[in-house]
């Protein structure tokens, strides 16, 4: 890689199933990986010898299911006991354990049992995307804009930012996926000047967002957002997988539920069938020797696939209704409905959406897999002063807080301070008081959600305001100040008005939240893993070179014409050097250096032995 640092910031769409990276140098470019693919699987695999990320990891998933990790985005920023985590664990072949309420992934790597946080797994995918960009740009990349689902809460946003830090990236901004896609639609298709209401329908591999934006004169104002951080293509695959499992059991009597390898092979076939059914009405699924020597073969029609997923498909309209209601806009006022995310290729999803908007033609001018990374790269260029076109130079993004933020009050009642769909960044204040006489300490539990009962919302953290003057209940004036930054991340301060005493929290004590020391430790660990990966690659290369050279020398020694060129009395020396090289090759943990020395030794013997007659 050439020296120097890339002055801009890359845009990374960190997806549940696939990730995508883009850069801006006079214009946006989506960067292909070493396989030539413009999207890279969000998979990390661990083996006794090495760590694999991306296509290489996904390709070996069936052979190594327990140590191939995916869906980290469905774990990041969540608690171990969350319903969605418990339900996903039933379908994942890898092991998830409870560490003080936070989920950790347990794998076998380099012959040891190791645990990784979802942030670390995500950081490995981010590192891969960074390396893909560096290979193309030829410079070191230090800055990035990373996208998250609009409906991600504070904990999930902060955890994603931490993943970027572990990957050695300065994450300039966390932006919402549908908003990034709106930029791609506006800038990429030249639609940013004309005034319009645009609904972004973003259904990906694991998450679903709907955002309603007003675009005019290069200003993108998010009016409302809604979604489901646990709905996407993976869920459609799971339903199809369950259907195929039942079919197989009917035909053979065998239940493959406990066989991780068979399940991975069948899931891959289900995913392929789902994609095929977007363009044809029927397809055949075949998996040779799926279980106990029994082959699997089944025909699936598009109608059956739609039937299997009918409830999930229908549920995608609920957030659409919600954003219209929140923005107080009727569906007839929507100028464009823009499709984003691979799962919007499903014809039934398109039909339901078009029918909801009374037969409206859906906007498909942007690539659903690449739009989010495209928008993130534009935002990266703006934040680093690298944007050159008039269209991007004056672009202004006004996003919103997806969920209400507030404080738990007496009786577990949620006191909202920042209502959902408030434009961010923002500062909001609300006054509270004491509930007991002579109370000198007040605890502020901070929640995010839409329910009146705090227990049904997400607890982000809590802090104490001490030194409140002892007064009768209800007399002290306590002001809670909520600051939400452009990343959607919250800082809360509480002030007692008569004394000016204050306490604050940037919610670092929430379950699973990493301290700066832990992040630093993980950064160092990531460097070690990278060094181990590089050492393994060098060893592999040296082994291949030695094998190839041994083979050519063996050919020379046994070929009557070629062996005639060897000096008299030298053949025995060549054979001895050949035996030495071969025995080095047999040593399993021989280092790259040992293998290189063996190759050099053999070359020296052969050079000396070749006759110059």
From Swiss-Prot:
Q: Which GO terms describe its biological process?
A: translation
List every stretch annotated Substrate binding domain (SBD): 403-613
What GO molecular-function term can you cite, just one? ATP-dependent protein folding chaperone
Example GO CC term: the record gives:
cytoplasm
InterPro entries in alphabetical order: ATPase_NBD, Heat_shock_70_CS, HSP70_C_sf, HSP70_peptide-bd_sf, Hsp_70_fam
Keyword annotations for this protein, in alphabetical order, are: ATP-binding, Chaperone, Cytoplasm, Hydrolase, Nucleotide-binding, Protein biosynthesis
Task: Enumerate the catalysed reactions.
Answer: ATP + H2O = ADP + phosphate + H(+)
Q: How does it assemble?
A: Binds to ribosomes. Binds close to the ribosomal tunnel exit via contacts with both ribosomal proteins and rRNA. Directly interacts with nascent polypeptides. This interaction is dependent on the ribosome-associated complex (RAC). Interacts with SSE1. Interacts with FES1.
Record family assignment: Belongs to the heat shock protein 70 family. Ssb-type Hsp70 subfamily.
Specify the protein name. Answer: Ribosome-associated molecular chaperone SSB1
- Say which species the protein is native to: Kluyveromyces marxianus
């Amino acid at each position: 890689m050439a020296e120097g640092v890339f002055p801009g910031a890359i845009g990374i769409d960190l997806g549940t199933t696939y990730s995508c990276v883009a850069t801006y140098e006079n214009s946006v470019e989506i960067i292909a990986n070493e396989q030539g693919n413009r999207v890279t699987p969000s998979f990390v695999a661990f083996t006794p010898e090495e760590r694999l990320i991306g296509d290489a990891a996904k390709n070996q998933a069936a052979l190594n299911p327990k140590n191939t990790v995916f869906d980290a985005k469905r774990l990041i920023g969540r608690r171990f006991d969350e319903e969605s985590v418990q339900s996903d664990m039933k379908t994942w072949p890898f092991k998830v354990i409870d560490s003080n309420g936070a989920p950790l992934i347990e794998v076998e790597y380099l012959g040891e049992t190791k645990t990784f946080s979802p942030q670390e797994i995500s950081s490995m995918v981010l590192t891969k995307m960074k390396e893909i960009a560096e290979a193309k740009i030829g410079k070191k990349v230090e800055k990035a804009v990373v996208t998250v689902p609009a409906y991600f809460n504070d904990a999930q946003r902060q955890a994603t930012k931490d993943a970027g830090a572990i990957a050695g990236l300065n994450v300039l901004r966390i932006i919402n996926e549908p908003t990034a896609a709106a930029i791609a639609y506006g800038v990429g298709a030249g639609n940013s000047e004309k005034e319009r209401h645009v609904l972004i329908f973003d259904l990906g591999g694991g998450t679903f967002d709907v955002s309603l934006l007003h675009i005019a004169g290069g200003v993108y104002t998010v009016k409302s957002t809604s979604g489901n951080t646990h709905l996407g293509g993976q869920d459609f695959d799971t339903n199809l997988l369950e259907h195929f499992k039942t079919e197989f059991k009917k035909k053979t009597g065998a239940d493959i539920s406990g066989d991780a390898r068979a399940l991975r092979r069948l899931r891959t076939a289900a995913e392929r069938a789902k994609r095929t059914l977007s363009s044809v009405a029927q397809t055949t699924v075949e998996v040779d020797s799926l279980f106990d020597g029994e082959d699997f073969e089944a025909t699936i029609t598009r109608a059956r696939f739609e039937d299997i997923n009918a409830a999930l498909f229908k549920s995608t309209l609920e957030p659409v209704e919600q954003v219209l209601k929140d923005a107080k806009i009727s569906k007839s006022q929507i100028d464009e409905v823009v499709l984003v995310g691979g799962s919007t290729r499903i014809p039934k999803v398109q039909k339901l959406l078009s029918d909801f908007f009374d037969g409206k033609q859906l906007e498909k001018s942007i690539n659903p897999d690449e739009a989010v990374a495209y928008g993130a790269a534009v935002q990266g260029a703006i934040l680093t002063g690298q944007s050159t076109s008039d269209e991007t130079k004056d672009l202004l993004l006004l996003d919103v807080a997806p969920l209400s933020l507030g404080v738990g009050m007496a009786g577990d009642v949620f006191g909202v301070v920042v209502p959902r769909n408030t434009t961010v960044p923002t500062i909001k204040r609300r006054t509270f008081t004491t509930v007991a006489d002579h109370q000198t300490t007040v605890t502020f539990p901070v929640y995010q959600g839409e329910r009146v009962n705090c227990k049904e919302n997400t607890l982000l953290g809590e802090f104490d305001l001490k030194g409140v003057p002892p007064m009768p209940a209800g007399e002290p004036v306590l002001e809670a100040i909520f600051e939400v930054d452009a990343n959607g991340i919250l800082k809360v301060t509480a002030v007692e008005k008569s004394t000016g005493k204050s306490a604050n929290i940037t919610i670092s004590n929430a379950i699973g939240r990493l301290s700066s020391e832990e992040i630093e430790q993980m950064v160092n660990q990531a460097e070690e893993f990278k060094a181990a990966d590089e050492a393994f690659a060098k060893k592999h290369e040296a082994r291949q070179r030695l094998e190839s050279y041994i083979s050519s020398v063996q050919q020379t020694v046994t070929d009557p014409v070629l062996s005639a060129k060897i000096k008299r009395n030298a053949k025995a020396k060549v054979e001895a050097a050949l035996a030495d090289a071969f025995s080095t090759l047999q040593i399993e943990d021989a280092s790259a250096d040992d293998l290189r020395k063996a190759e050099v030794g053999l070359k020296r013997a052969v050079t000396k032995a070749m006759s110059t007659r």
